[in-house]
Structures are given as structure tokens and as C-alpha cells.
């Protein structure tokens, strides 16, 4: 059970970041060997079954290319202050998981662009290596040539301006920088991503037809699979943009209600009776909430001896949401609620290290639902 959350088999770590081969990677390895192996066998009949060993070596070189691409993202992400959680090479090439507050367009663009640049460097290194390998080392030259082509293609393809490709993140950052709106950047890059997805399938089908050839079924199906992945990623970016625009309509102040702060050792009779009370431990860490209704239910002579800790409802870890001001939108609150999950009912809002009040998840949802409803124009 300890390994249940792992995305695959761990290769090692990079500056503390675990690097995995995803569980879907063997699928792409089998596809590559099944397609590249016969091509090698046709070109070099003397190799026999060794052609498939050459194809297997190519899958390892392809894996190194993917890891290099994702490692570039991870290293620059760490440099820009991102918390990088893992690197995974999987069916879709690979991905780097990290946590960030989308601090700036520059950070987003830098993290995005270095992945394709890493592939471009590998392609250039391979091209230079071709000139150093003797002509009679045909298999070595074949492998190096395949690495050059693959990395060159990946570098160019990933720079196409559409989500979820790296070029899409660069486009997103540019629009974000020009408009000051991350939602606008995501929306533009998301729709461009859908154009790229459709164009990719069209290119796979139309290009052979222009040459007077019949499109190969395998490559058409593969392009449809890749385009489907691109379409879903682009759709996610569009949905995120729309959500961001919705969140921007509601300010933290709109859903915030006041709350008093009290140590968990305080007597209940000494607590404010008409407002919520946030209970903190001896270190000042908030861990519970007492609603006015709970104080009223416990009212009576015995209340004089009841401690706040006995009445407080324990809150789940992650219930504290930090914001720079109560005048910002509720994006940080929504993220905090999503991170905690369904168990949370309240968020404690903290500004500059000081509690500012409480936000009920129900009130947050109601405010967003109200903001989403179109307003009727005055008659």
C-alpha cells in the first residue's frame, strides 16, 4: 500500500525530485519496437533478430530524451520557486508535476520553453556526433540519426502555440503579460490548442494525399490518439480560464464573516456568545471552530467550567487559506477547498499571518453560483 500513490517505477531522484517510468511507458516501448524493429530489419537483413535489439536500444534513448525534457522543466521550475513533486515518463511522453501560484508570466514562459530547448540541444549534439562516427558504423549512425530526428521533431512540435504543449504555455504567458489576465492567456492558448489538435490530424491525412499516396491506417490512428490528448488538454485550459473569470467576480471580503480567536484552554463562559470562535493551541496554531449555536446549547451553570477545547469542532489539515488581502478574488480559497476535499466545511482566512475571519464552503459555493447566473438588464 505504501507504493499505491506512485505513478510507476522510480528511476532515481533529481535534486530531491523522484523520477519515474510511468506504468503506461511499456505501451509506447512496445509500439516503438513493433514499428521500428521491422524497419531496421528491412534496412539491415544481416542483423536478424538483432534488429529488435536495436529498436529496444532506441526506446531507451527515447526515454532519456523524455527525461531530459522533463528534467529541464523541473530544474528551471525549482529555480523559479516552484515546488516540484515528481517527473514521470509515460504514454504521452512525460510530465512534471509541481505546485505553484502562477507567480508571473516570466516564470511560466521560462519553465515551458526549456523543455523543447533541451530536445533541441540533444538533436544538435546528435547531429555533431554523426560527423564523428565512421560511415561503416551503420547501426550506430542509424540510432544517432533517429535520436536527432526524434528530438528535433519533439522540440518543434512542443513549441506549437496551443495548450497543453509547451508552446501553449508560452502563448498563455505572452497574453497574460500583455493583458494582465491569466484567464485571458489560458483561453487564447486553449482555443489555439484545439486548432493544433485538428490541424495535426489534418496534416497526417492530407500530406500523403497531396503526394498521391494513401494515408497509412496506423499513423492516422496514432495521430487521432495524440489529437485527442491535445483536445482534452486544450479543453481543460479553456475550462480553467472560464473558472478563473468566475472566481474573479467574487472577492474574499464578499464571503468572509468575522471570528474571534481564543486559546483552547479558555473557559467557554468567557468566549464571545454572538460570533464564531477560532480555537488555537498553545503554539497559536488554529485547529477548531466554535459556532454561537454550540455555545448556546451548552449554556447553563456548567458552562463556567467547560474549556473551549471541549466545544470546538476539529478542522481538517489544510483548512487555513492565506491571501494577500481580503480584496483579492476567491481563487486561493477554491484551491484550498479542493486540496482538502469534501471533509471541509470552513476555511480560516489569514492575511499577513493574522486571522481575518471564516468562510463557509457553502457560502463560497452560493456566491460563485450567484456570480455565474446572468443578470437581467433593467427595463
What are these model-derived regions, one by one?
Residues 1-379:
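Hydrophobic transmembrane alpha-helices and their immediate loop junctions
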